[in-house]
């Protein structure tokens, strides 16, 4: 089988396509939640904390000198990204929980009893013969 044919079979499998759709939707969902956090939630948190903009929080290790920029640790941006992650994770958790509740449990048909092996069949025949 040629390399191209193998790749084509791999690419058109349902799981790969489902995963690709999930990645695209997840990316769009991430942008929505990032906007929710950055544009709606964090301004409210900033007002509640006295007008603090978390993305501006930083520790300056070395001041700017001439054309050289200052060396900083931008921990405020880390706080912002962490809050984004927590909200995204919580939203995904709620979505999965809702989907699982909407799914109807599949009715499981009772399994047919397993067919006895040869030894059991032979013993049953002997028993039946002894009853006669």
Curated annotation (Swiss-Prot):
The chain crosses the membrane at residues 10-30, 76-96. One of its GO terms (molecular function) is mechanosensitive monoatomic ion channel activity. Disulfide bonds: none annotated. It is a multi-pass membrane protein. Gene3D superfamilies: Large-conductance mechanosensitive channel, MscL, domain 1. InterPro entries: Mechanosensitive_channel_CS (IPR019823), MS_channel (IPR001185), MSC/AndL (IPR037673), MscL_channel (IPR036019). It comes from the Bacteria. Keywords: Cell inner membrane, Cell membrane, Ion channel, Ion transport, Membrane, Transmembrane, Transmembrane helix, Transport. SUPFAM superfamilies: Gated mechanosensitive channel. The keyword Cell membrane applies. It is found in: Cell inner membrane. GO terms for cellular component: plasma membrane. Channel that opens in response to stretch forces in the membrane lipid bilayer. May participate in the regulation of osmotic pressure changes within the cell. Homopentamer. Belongs to the MscL family. This is Large-conductance mechanosensitive channel. It comes from Campylobacter hominis (strain ATCC BAA-381 / DSM 21671 / CCUG 45161 / LMG 19568 / NCTC 13146 / CH001A). The lineage of its organism: Bacteria, Pseudomonadati, Campylobacterota, Epsilonproteobacteria, Campylobacterales. The gene is mscL.
